[in-house]
Design a protein with these regions (language model features):
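Cation-handling catalytic/transport regions enriched in His/Asp/Glu
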Residues: 1-193
């Protein structure tokens, strides 16, 4: 309806570029077009929570680190916090596409490069990127031959898998929502997408 039959045919696949995400990974950019919020909607607005709690970019990464620690991974090394890029620098141009780096496995030099925006999409992306980082950290002690993911697809799947853990229960555990809000959100399957 929004774009018309000439752009998006009524019968057929939705062109991936219409999602507003170059990799077709998320529908969040067209959420307002495909979901009409009803008066009894119970979806959780993570962006608003981040704003209301005045959570900064580093704190967003700390939430993700705490998640990985809670499932048995070791803390990130101090060098991660010293050498990663979390906020877009004002003094130079950088490519802001989020990425994870394993620069020196012998010294556990792990970093992310990301111009974090204080919103839900980046909160999820941080968890994805730290999925890569913790995966790197898990195999850095192995012989050089084995210091790599099983394949690139598996590395991406690992990062994406962990983002699926950002559920109402998780948001309750990190004190973003109350138990009642989490339970109400779980009743709205569209809101969980």
């Amino acid at each position: 309806e929004h774009y018309g039959d000439e752009v998006v045919p009524d019968s057929g696949p939705l062109p991936v570029h219409m999602l507003g995400n170059m990799w077709g990974q998320s529908w969040s950019n067209i959420y307002d077009l495909v979901y009409t919020e009803e008066s009894n909607s119970n979806s959780i607005n993570v962006t608003k929570i981040i704003e209301d709690k005045e959570i900064d970019e580093i704190e967003m990464v700390r939430y993700a680190e705490d998640f990985f620690i809670s499932i048995g991974f070791d803390s990130l090394p101090d060098t991660f916090w010293e050498r990663s890029l979390f906020v877009k620098p004002r003094d130079r141009s950088v490519v802001c596409h989020a990425s994870a780096w394993n620069l020196d496995p012998a010294n556990n030099d792990l970093r992310i490069k990301m111009c974090i925006q204080k919103n839900e999409e980046d909160f999820i992306t941080i968890h994805h990127e730290l999925g890569h980082i913790f995966y790197y950290q898990a195999y850095n002690h192995l012989p050089t031959l084995f210091q790599g993911g099983a394949n690139d697809g598996f590395h991406e799947a690992f990062g994406d898998l962990l983002t699926l853990s950002i559920t109402p229960d998780y948001l309750q555990k990190i004190d973003f929502v109350s138990e009642e809000e989490a339970n109400l959100a779980k009743q709205d399957p569209i809101g969980l997408l």
